[in-house]
Every structure is written in C-alpha cells, then in structure tokens.
Amino acid sequence: MKIFAVRDEDNTTNKAVAYLFCYEKEKRFYIELPEEADPWETPLILSSFLKKGQKTINAYWSRIWVQQRIVPSDRQNLGMILRDNGLDFYDEYKLLTMTNGRCSQDSYYLEPISEKDIPKEFVKRNQQKVEDVIPLPENQLLVFFRDGCVKKHDLVQLASTDKRFAPVLQNENTFRAVNVETDGYGICWGENLCIECGKLYATGKKVPLSMEEFKCFVRERVVDSAEAAEELACSKQNVDDLAKRGKLHPIKEGAKYRLFLKSEVMQRKWK
C-alpha cells in the first residue's frame, strides 16, 4: 500500500485536502477526506460526497478521480506514450505517480507520505472497517468489524433496491461467495459489487459476540477426521465411512479433509 497526500498548489497553507490510498497488487484506490475538509477546497468530484457527509470515497469513485488525472485508456497514441515512459502495459498507478498526479484541469498534486503521517481520526475510521464476513442462511450476513463490533445484516434490506444485487439474492452459491473488500473497506461479490463498511457499521443488528469468542468456538468445537477418530477410538477410515453413510455430517470437506462439529462426534459416541 502507498499513501499520498493530495495538496493544492494554489493553497498557501499547503494542507492536505484529501488522502489517496493505493493498493498496487489489487489495483484499487480509496480516498479519505479529513474531518475538517472544506467543500470549496476539495476536488470537485469529491466535494459532492463531502456535502452528503461522506468522508470515505469508495473504490469506484476513487478510481474515477484517478482516471481523470492520467492518460485515458482510449487515447489514440496510447501505445507510443506507454513506450516513451517505459511501460509495457496500461498501469493506472504508474501513470498517476510519474506525474505526481498533476493534470492540466486543476492545481492538485500528490505527495507521498508514510502511514504515521495520516490524520489521527483515520485510526478511528479504520476500526470501523470489516474484519471478516460470514454468509448465513436466508441471505443473512454476520459481519465482524475491527473494533470488535459484530452485526447481523439482511442483504434483502441492504440491497434489494439495487438491481445489480439481483443475481446475488437469487443464487445461494453466488451469495456465499461474499468476500471482504480490500483492506476492509466493505464486503464484495467480485470486483465491483460492493457494500461499504460505513453503511454496514451504521445499520444491521448488533450481536453480542466477539471475533475472539467465535475463534474460540472454532478452535475448541471443530475437529478434523483424525481428532474425530481419536474421540471415537476408531480409525480415520471408520470416520470416513460414517460420513459416507450419513451417520456423521461434515461441516466442511475437501478432497483430503473433513471437518466436524465436536458435539456431533460426541453424540455418536453415546449411541
């Protein structure tokens, strides 16, 4: 991750009007606006978010801002421009940094900074990012946040008005493919279908559970085939046979492993 302060050459205070976070491997950008950000000093495309009270700009609009400052991908002489700058392919990050983010439309530019130089209020925002997400039955989601908060969400309520989510709501396998967005900025299905962490944190039903408690359950109450065999005083082959005959029900399995709830293994022992 690389961090840049967005400054305005025409602003004599030289203060940062925004901060750009670049994730090179993921090829994603996010913009954070300071708490004291002034709409009149903020880049135009970002000021509209500020007026709505949003200070974290999602990946889509952050990338739009970046794209407005670099050579467009449909430029007729793009190949020559890339060769002249030693680039083998169109790389938004490299095109942005080679000019320090300057463009002819305004006086904004980028200055590299270290993580210790970002505003302290960003630390609090980071605590409200997503740590993990678990898909539950009936389009429910269990979302863990970095500050320890856990919330249960109904995706129907979250996204039913957004037609882009229809395939997710209509297909369980697609729904279960939910992932944490880059650096916890939200949850996503694929690259562009995302729900921001701020919306998730502000809504949903709080659950009296912590990530550590959840880990404790998994650590103490989930066993593999070898542990199940030891508990039942039998071989792994016997455990596999019980699973094949529907006497034990794996909660997760792959080509070379099976995981079981310890409680079910214990119940089998009593029969």
Q: How does the language model describe each region?
A:
Residues K27-L33, S160-L169:
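A short, polar/charged loop-to-alpha-helix boundary motif
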